[in-house]
Amino acid sequence: MAKVETKNEGLVEKLVAVDRVAKVVKGGRIFSFTALTVVGDGNGRVGFGRGKAREVPAAISKALEAARRNMITVDLAGTTLQHPVNARHGASRVYMQPASEGTGVIAGGAMRAVLEAAGVHNVLAKCYGSTNAANVVNATFKGLRDMTSPEKVAAKRGKSVEEIQG
């Protein structure tokens, strides 16, 4: 679950995961921390980042900085998605589909953080396979990035939006 939720520069910042990792050397283990964060404006722009440092706060600040640099724009249909989306990253597979008004965000931990930061308020989502937070966030991003609006599809095909939607 996303732990920290702060607003900075109009951006919603969410901490998805913090892990302790170890580097094994001759004299023993050197511990450090990795942080996974999601940043979004709640209006179709969202980014994620990973940071690693010897202390947790430093790892989180590095991850937030990386997330601000790694932002994408998502074509939303009001408060939901344009169409159902499948995506995968590693062994994680995600499925997201638009939902009617009032449904809410029905999604698991890491996916929920990304969708809420992007400004999606009504969606049905499911994660299959690996539930590793980093892979789920990556797969969710791939799905959101590959989603296209009817206007873009119509422009590519040289047709009107009415012809595309039937």
UniProtKB/Swiss-Prot annotation:
NCBIfam families per the UniProt record, alphabetical: rpsE_bact
Family annotation (Pfam families): Ribosomal_S5, Ribosomal_S5_C
Chain ranges of the S5 DRBM domain: 11-74
Molecular function terms, GO-annotated: rRNA binding; structural constituent of ribosome
Function in brief: With S4 and S12 plays an important role in translational accuracy. Located at the back of the 30S subunit body where it stabilizes the conformation of the head with respect to the body.
SUPFAM superfamilies in alphabetical order: dsRNA-binding domain-like, Ribosomal protein S5 domain 2-like
Keywords recorded for this protein, A-Z: Ribonucleoprotein, Ribosomal protein, RNA-binding, rRNA-binding
Lineage: Bacteria, Pseudomonadati, Pseudomonadota, Gammaproteobacteria, Moraxellales
Organism expressing this protein natively: Acinetobacter baumannii (strain ATCC 17978 / DSM 105126 / CIP 53.77 / LMG 1025 / NCDC KC755 / 5377)
Listed name of the protein: Small ribosomal subunit protein uS5
PANTHER family per UniProt: MITOCHONDRIAL RIBOSOMAL PROTEIN S5
Listed InterPro entries: Ribosomal_Su5_D2-typ_SF, Ribosomal_uS5, Ribosomal_uS5_bac-type, Ribosomal_uS5_C, Ribosomal_uS5_N, Ribosomal_uS5_N_CS, Ribsml_uS5_D2-typ_fold_subgr
